[in-house]
Amino acid sequence: MATLHAPAFELPEILNTKTNLADARIGAQVIECSDDFFAEAKRMLQFEAPIFVEDKFDDHGKWMDGWETRRKRHAGYDWCIVKLGVSGKISALDIDTTFFTGNYPASASLEACYAPNGDLTGVTWQSILENTELGPSQHHIFMVNNDAIFTHIRLNIFPDGGVARLRVYGDVHIQVTDHEQTLDLLALENGGRVIAYSDAHFGHPRNLINPGRGVNMGDGWETKRRRAPGYDWCILALGKSGKIEKIEIDTAHFKGNFPAEVSIQAVYLENATDAQLIPQSMFWSYLLEAQPMQMDHIHEYVNEILKHEKISHIRINMIPDGGISRVRLWGKIAKS
């Protein structure tokens, strides 16, 4: 059986530093749906790009990599409620119908609500996307102008059909405020985010702050082979400023392509724009001087951490190039 892979798709640059709040890897899950006879709704939340396997059928018909409902024979429409992996502000939507050609929905709308306790009884759903026409086998990017914090979304498809992937791009809302608790201040679920990077040819630096260890080499930050002097770097913002007690640099799955060394610079800045940070970052003080890397290994540093006060941003320098899977900054949230 031949397997077709989704065509390459370049996300609009404005969304490169946003988080997919509906990513199953960070805990997004389907709560309820009207129907998923042909293909389970949870497939729509997978990180991997959709595939099409020719001649693959199951007991319900043609196997499809996404959410697909049966043909509607009465009035109405289909819907799916998703709990976001982390609450946050929604900046954009990607309703992807890749490989759904004669079975894509005619149109779709999306609503969102805030229900931190998970109880959706009596919640107020806000319209994020009005009913909008969809096309076959393509990405549909919709920008959202709404500053509210949301925990759940409801995708409505009219009247029925299939969606390969649903991605909800936005900024994580930080809920942790305990100043005595030690936590990963850089973690995605705690509000960490990517600001800028020198290169992301093989893997995006947003993977550095994902939960758990990397599942493969593609689940990390990897740059192209450097053919000129210098090194690669990325700038990240902590979810909350704090003082760092322990650093972890994980090169899981990187064996012939791990960097020779990694160093970390840091700074505390209030109200700085992302554009301001990039040229200033090369002058930030070192939090961790260049450390030699090993392949496929978790490197832990405590005594090597240099004296510092609270920090809000870091710059990771990967010398000269290569790939790392995860970076963890364990510490406590700074008191105001």
Swiss-Prot record:
It comes from the Bacteria. It catalyses: allantoate + H2O = (S)-ureidoglycolate + urea. GO terms for molecular function: allantoicase activity. Pathway: Nitrogen metabolism; (S)-allantoin degradation; (S)-ureidoglycolate from allantoate (aminidohydrolase route): step 1/1. One of its GO terms (biological process) is purine nucleobase metabolic process. Its EC number is 3.5.3.4. Keywords: Hydrolase, Purine metabolism. The keyword Hydrolase applies. Pfam families: Allantoicase. NCBIfam families: allantoicase. PANTHER family: ALLANTOICASE, INACTIVE ALLANTOICASE-RELATED. This is Probable allantoicase. It comes from Acinetobacter baumannii (strain AYE).
